[in-house]
Amino acid sequence: MNPKPSGRAGDAEAGVRLAAPGDLDPAGAGMRLLEREEELQRIAAAIASARAGTGAVVALEGSAGIGKTRLLWAAMERAAESDVAVISARGGQMETEFAFGVARQLFEPVLAAAETGEREVLLEGAAAPAALLLGGGRADRLGEPVGGGDRSFATLHGLYGMTSKLAARAPLLIVVDDAHWADVPSLRFLGYLARRVHGLPMLLLVAVRPEDPGAHGLLLTELVAGPEVDVVRPGPFTLDAVRTLVQDAFAPASLDPRFVRGCWTTTGGNPFLLMQLIGALRVRGVQPTSDAVEQIGEVGLTTVSRWINLRLAALPPSATALAEAVAVLGDGADAVQAAGLAGLDADSCDVAVDGLVSMSILRGADGLAFVHPLVRSAIYAELAPRRRARAHREAARLLWHAGAAAEGVASHLLAAAPAGDGEVVEILLDAARSATRKGAPDLAVRYLRRALAEPAHDTSRPELLRELGTAEQNAGQFAAAAEDLRRALECTDDIAAKIEIAFRLRTALVWSDRAHEVAPALGGLIAEAAKRDSEGALLLEAAVAGALQVDLSTPRRLRGRVRQVVGPAFAGEPVPPHISSLAAVEALFANEPAARVLRLAEEAARGSYQAPEFARAPMRAQLFVALIFAEGHSLARRLLDDEVEDARQHGSAAQFLNAAVLRSMLFYRLGTLAEAEADARAALEAAHLHLGTGPSGAGPPAASLHAPMAVAVLLDTLIERGNIEDAERVLTESGLAHTDSPLLLFTFLIGARARLRAAQGRTPEAIDELLALGARIEGALLTPALVPWRSQAALALAGEDADEARRLACEELELARVFGAPRTLGVALHAAALTGPVNERVGLLREAVAVLEDSPARLEHARALVELGAALRRQGQRSEARTALERGMDGAWSCGATALAQRAREELRASGSRPRRLALSGVDALTGAERRVADLAAQGLTNRQIAQALVVSVPTVETHLRHVFRKLDITSRKQLAEHLGSEQPAEP
């Protein structure tokens, strides 16, 4: 390929025009809207919902030519009449390889039309991460993301922030036509947005073809199939509608019924085909009489391609050449480039354009565009495969010479055959890096795989494999990443580069449930690094040791390798932070005193940013685990808050997923159930959107380290709320009801699954799960801090095997006393009290209450108080029992633990007290936190403003509002004031 001319901006999109926003002028726009009353009513109702602040999502689903675009046009007209702002975009077959192409169509015109100051405001705050994609704002201040430059989650979060800002200015209609041709990152954004429209002055309106889902049908299916989506399916015209349109077109004195029926049966009532048939008949001078019925068949409009061929046959060959060029370049093609691709001079091009417009093949508008996507598809399909590939390579050459961005050129190179051109490799590599920076690793993977096929020169192959493996990892394709990173390692000579590749390989193997392969994969490199880079060798030893830690099936002889690596830290010697974090986890697993675990974790935290960037993610994950379970709550909360915010501002989905799921566990252990639920749901959504898992975590093992933990936290919060049926549904939908793995974070899922079975009365299943878990982790995980399987099993066994229950509870209590952390000890004391001798019960429960009194673990404190009150009541100490029960009920209610609060209320009634009824619906059912959020929302504050006022996260506010709406049985924020009135929140 010719080199790119100097003086051209590298990111200019000269000659590459995304379908113009708002340019949704449908073929037959002047046609009357017939038999669409119901569709228009549903769209009007959705617009009214947006104006009322309720929010709505509508999907127009139907075959090509059925009139979806015409309905979108009508919706935009109605919105404009209702003072609703409109932004629009259209997917295109040649635009599926543009990172966030549809999203950019939506927002770039808004920013282009804004004054400089207004543009800065639009791209501030939550929208700031979108600045790199959309331009303007403070993109230069965003910093670099962690781990390979992937900004996928940050970009998504920024686009949502931008959308929220626009909706805050005025009710907003977002229109996306041909969403089945939207690029994958934009589809992710639309799905992300659809789940958040509720309660916002916004309508998301998309048009899709169910039979043409593109290469990303799952994302599209989920966008349309969501519970919040109203799917509108316009049908074909009836015979009556066809009669009306034929009458309008021909205005005859009389209309022959057989002619009308012939038009109807030939087109199947498809509006687009019908209008094209009518146009073709009129060009021939046909009148709608019985004599003309046979001519309908002669026109032969049974397929679009046949109709196009008939029209092109009436034009000079130059018109066909130009039509084919536009089909290759895509809608919105520049006339000069289309002429170049067609081999036409300017005058011949003008003549060809005029002819194509006159035959209703091209639209008469800026840029060259077909009257309907069906037309482009038909012309493109007529090109023989080899000719098509050559045309795309020539299109790439023309665009590159014109200064187009690498991504625009790469979309054509993907459709061109490899030819051993080194310049092509450079363009594709440039495009991949651009896609990664914008948060579209999926596209980067496609570009890089194509670059490898060119084929690449030997000198560029290591770099391509390294970048491909990193992109695959960012896209959640961990198995593929592992294989490509292995290949990169084999053909790389530089030791520093090899160490970085090895770290990425380690992550890919662990995340694809193959942690046991890490040690053999990195063994040879460690020996090599020991001779050439001693610090690098230590990093690699820590990487292998960390993988051995998270795989609980690691043989005892290999676990000794971990002890060898962390030995200097245990001896008190100065060590790098990645060794301190590893040592903290090793001490935690071995049930060494929590104070020692925290000391090592705090040392790691102080130097956590001294490690190389590629080594930080596993090190910080170890740090967070040590802090959470050794109960260094304050530092854990601060660091995790920073990590979540960093991911939102300029991080990847993997970074957010890791931080959110660990913070959800922290929140659950603290008893802040709404926050725990919010983070767990956000983590599952991130796993689903970016890493290919199912709605609640099901799917390939892309998120095997984190989705099970998020499901575990979600199960636990629902159990505490008494929502057992919801918990079972979450578990079933996750696909993890029977899944097992030796990886560490699966132990949390097994524990939560057992708690659910016990709550359902399926005690034998709970016991089997817990005892099997205990047998598996024996020797690898001694501490009860992570998963207290012994106390859980003891409580389940108490009614069947009291001796075994007591043995397990005593064993856990002994371990917990050594560990010394309040929550861990309180949980063990609670189990020992309920399974031990009755005469020791009150004493053990008093100790549990005392241990937890000053701990931030509010839920466990409330649980201990309720059990103490119940035990005191049974001993006849009613006054003291009531005090404990009332405190326990208050604590449980403030946590949102409805089931425990209800239990406390029942015990109070049994003690002779008359506690206030715990309402399950209505204003009295709101917890204090829910009422505070509801009051601020009723005052008109946005979710972000509420979050700032209450110092909580936006997802937490969303979770509270979801509970408020359910309890009050409302659908709009505007209904809050009338339901809340002047009443005060009910506290038991």
Question: Predicted segments — roles?
Answer:
Residues 57, 71-75, 79, 351-352, ...:
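Extended alpha-helical scaffolding segments used for macromolecular assembly and cargo binding
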